[in-house]
A protein has these predicted regions:
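Glycine-rich, histidine-containing beta strand-loop boundary motifs that form or position
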Residues: 46-47, 203, 380
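TOPRIM fold recognition
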Residues: 1-13, 32-35, 43, 53, ...
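Short capping/connector residues at structural and topological boundaries
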Residues: 145, 300, 426-429
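Short, charged/polar, Gly/Pro-enriched secondary-structure boundary elements
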Residues: 60-64, 199, 429-430
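Non-catalytic accessory segments of DNA primases and related replication-initiation nucleases
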Residues: 1-187, 209-234, 242, 248-252, ...
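Phosphate-handling DNA/RNA-contact segment within nucleic-acid enzymes
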Residues: 151-371
């Protein structure tokens, strides 16, 4: 099996060692569910399947910024294949200074296609051409291998400069290998800026998300794939040493289907729409690099401020907003600057710090301390606030930030006025602010 097919077929995604100097490998539950919380994404299992790091269900042991450590019971083991032929050589992510240089050179070779300009300037987002240029949004390249080749020429023809940069990897062909950039051609690249205005990653927004399969409670060698969009799937299983097709049909979205063979349950499969916003990563690909260790935060400021923010300059703010989604945070920062009074700007600020998910709130601590933040206002999408996992994470975050001398507010509003802070502000409303005590 080629490296590309191996990466695409995985239900577990390899991540780097969680401990320096350790040979223990960890794998993220990508297209299968975590046995602890029953959800996909964020959670990880080690290569002996004896430990799980769950990002949602707490335990007595906090495992760094990743989540909580759980010991795997025998009946929770699923018998995944962790053999060496499942491993792919990837590289440790380079520092933010280097990422910024390479990503900036990469963006210089890209342009904006009409469909993305129309999407950003439309009534739903109302982003001007000037702001599009200032924020350096770009369309994903149609021929990423050519763009990567051009970048390699810019850095003196040395591929070593792009190794260790998430997104870049070596593609395997019958004629050899060449470097290219991972992602979807039908997407918009959204730069992630750190507290020094360095581009340290990208999210990409997919124009037309496709359906994908998720499996749970399954036996080894149980696999499910979408063979025809939107909803025709095929399930395969190894029987007497041979991979056999045991189910092929159209299925309903979000329904769990139990798959049996000769009276024995083999697993369950669900069809769901892939996320519209995805991190640029080449983890699990040959000479690729994962986006984590650590995951990037994104610091969104109004475009008038971004124009004058020098690269490498530490941003200092007394007050910030905390939200999710980099594009949404860019829009929120722009509209906070327009809608808030001068007094409100002094009280709450117009800087929005975007995190990859509320469960990874720990990655906020050091950046907020370096920024000199005294007060943070959480403004998560209103449909998330009733989620018990979100509530627990917010409480833990508030307690930790309070211990660091940072007071916490929460923003709330009628969901009928907009799901997210960006939607609310675009409808010319501002949220109610409450203090967490």
């Amino acid at each position: 099996m080629s490296i590309e097919k191996l990466a695409a077929s995985r239900i577990l995604r390899p991540v780097r060692s969680m401990n320096k100097g350790s040979n223990e490998r960890w794998f993220e539950y990508c297209r299968t569910t975590c046995p602890i919380c029953g959800k996909q994404g964020w959670c990880m299992v080690n290569d002996s399947e004896t430990k799980i790091i769950c990002g949602r269900i707490s335990s007595e042991t906090v495992f760094g910024e990743a989540g909580y450590l759980h010991i795997v019971a025998e009946d929770q083991k699923r018998g995944y294949d962790f053999s060496q032929d499942q491993m792919i050589k990837e590289h440790r992510k380079k520092n933010d200074y280097t990422l910024d240089i390479i990503y900036t050179l990469f963006l210089e070779s890209l342009d904006m296609r009409d469909e993305h300009i129309k999407m950003l300037r439309g009534s739903k987002r109302r982003i001007t051409r000037e702001v599009i240029n200032v924020r350096n949004y770009k369309s994903f390249p149609i021929k990423p291998w050519d763009t990567t080749k051009e970048l390699i020429k810019k850095v003196g023809g040395k591929t070593s400069y792009i190794v260790g940069i998430p997104g870049f990897y070596a593609k395997e062909t019958k004629d050899g290998r060449y470097f290219t950039f991972a992602g979807r051609r039908d997407s918009l690249l959204i730069p992630q800026r750190n507290i020094y205005n360095q581009i340290c990653g990208f999210q990409y927004r997919i124009d037309d998300p496709e359906y994908m399969t998720v499996v749970k409670n399954h036996k080894p060698s149980f696999k499910a794939e979408v063979i025809e969009q939107p909803n025709t799937i095929e399930v395969t299983y190894k029987i007497n040493g041979k991979i056999e097709s045991i189910f092929k049909d159209k299925v309903d979205v979000k329904e769990w289907y139990e798959i049996n063979y000769e009276g024995e349950k083999l697993g369950e499969v669900q069809l769901k729409l892939e996320s519209k916003y995805i991190w640029i990563s080449s983890g699990g690909r040959f000479h690729g690099t994962g986006v984590g260790n650590p995951l990037p935060i994104h610091v969104a400021v109004p475009s008038r401020e971004l124009k004058n923010w020098e690269r490498g300059e530490l941003i200092k703010k007394d007050n910030v907003w905390i939200s999710e989604g980099s594009l949404k945070s860019d829009i929120a920062a722009e509209n906070l600057d327009e809608l808030l009074t001068n007094e409100e700007k002094l009280m709450y600020g117009t800087t929005v710090v975007s995190i990859p998910g509320v469960k990874v709130w720990r990655i906020l601590i050091e950046p907020l301390k370096k920024m000199g933040v005294k007060q943070a206002t959480f403004a998560l999408d209103m449909d998330m606030i009733t989620n018990s996992d979100v509530q627990r994470s917010l409480l833990e975050c508030a307690q930790t930030l309070y211990q660091e001398g940072i007071s916490i507010n929460y923003a709330s509003w009628d969901i009928n006025l907009g799901k997210g802070l960006d939607d609310l502000l675009l409808n010319d409303y501002i949220p109610a602010i409450g203090k967490v005590r």
